Regions:
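Hydrophobic transmembrane alpha-helices and immediately adjacent juxtamembrane helices
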Residues: 1-310
Length: 310
């Protein structure tokens, strides 16, 4: 077993061990272990590529890190306008609680959209690295994920100072927020790995992704609550695995609800609608876990064909 030093264009020297570790490992568990081992071994490269992505994003930008909150603000303002228009039609005013929910869900949705949009093309836009230098290709979409996480952290920090003005106070159910954000991170990671891999083999994937992200906000409860869609409509909306996460954020942070307890309400039309059920959280967690495992395996087992398709 020998070690071979290689250098990549990000400026990080890495070492690849040639020998038994390079032999294909049978089984899903073995493949996952190999993926994690490679990511740990190349963690410095992952961090360097993340720093590169952040630097490129803000280099010579007049607004600087202000761009990190521009997209969330744009989404939130759009949500405010939509809810205001809906309130004018229904005759029910929009309260601070609704605005707080839109702001919180808008930042979370912006993280998903920004990451997927940027990460889908990471393999094709880094063709020089993919075709010439050995490293686990997973670090390319994951570096985009971490760079967007940096941006979202800035947005969430700003939101922390805004929410108290919208009536959100300190309470124990705020502890649900980190768990829900972690689930969103996992689902986003699964999407970035799968879509970046798919886009390498089918270049029109990036256009399909842009269309889905553009119209996806209308099928995701960012500007509205699922209960507004009625008993059947709310169930359909919550089939989107991101929907229970966004609603969980609103229910726990804004409404101070314990997500373990189911909650039902009666609509203006007299229909009883389930506003929250912990099964939704279980559903999202299952999709996040299985989706990440599946996308990681697909990505890993397709790597051998990356260089010839880049």
């Amino acid at each position: 077993m020998t070690g071979t030093a290689v250098s990549n264009e990000a400026g990080v020297a890495t070492t690849r061990t040639v020998g038994d570790a390079d032999m294909p490992t049978a089984g899903i568990v073995g493949s996952l272990r190999e993926i994690l081992s490679d990511l740990v071994r190349y963690r410095e490269l992952l961090m360097e590529l993340t720093r590169r992505d952040i630097t490129i994003r803000y280099k010579q930008a007049v607004m600087g890190f202000g761009w990190a909150i521009f997209m969330p603000i744009l989404i939130v303002l759009s949500g405010f306008l939509v809810r205001f228009a809906m309130s004018q039609m229904s005759g029910r005013p929009v309260g601070a609680e609704q605005l707080a929910g839109i702001a919180l869900k808008g930042v979370a949705w912006s993280f998903f959209v920004g990451t997927v949009s940027f990460a889908t093309t990471t393999l094709t836009s880094n063709s020089n690295l993919v075709s010439k230098v050995y490293f686990p290709r997973e670090v390319l979409p994951l570096s985009a994920l971490l760079a967007q996480t940096f941006d979202t952290t800035i947005g969430l920090t700003a939101l922390v100072f805004v929410l108290p003005f919208l009536g959100v106070t300190l309470h124990p159910n705020l502890l649900w927020a980190p768990l829900l954000l972690a689930l969103l991170f996992l689902i986003t990671a699964a999407a970035t790995l799968f879509l970046s891999c798919a886009n390498l083999f089918f270049r029109d994937v990036k256009y399909i992704v842009q269309v889905l992200l553009t119209f996806g906000i209308f099928f995701t409860p960012v500007f509205y609550e699922p209960a507004m869609m009625g008993p059947i409509g709310s169930k359909l909306v919550l089939l989107n695995p991101i929907a229970p996460i966004l609603e969980g954020l609103r229910m726990s942070v804004v409404e101070n609800h314990n997500l373990i307890t189911p909650l039902a309400r009666t609509t203006a039309a007299g229909h009883s609608v389930i506003v929250w059920t912990p099964l939704g959280l279980l559903y999202s967690a299952t999709v996040a876990t299985l989706g990440l495992i599946a996308s990681a395996l697909i990505f890993h087992r397709s790597e051998s064909a990356f260089a010839e398709n880049v």
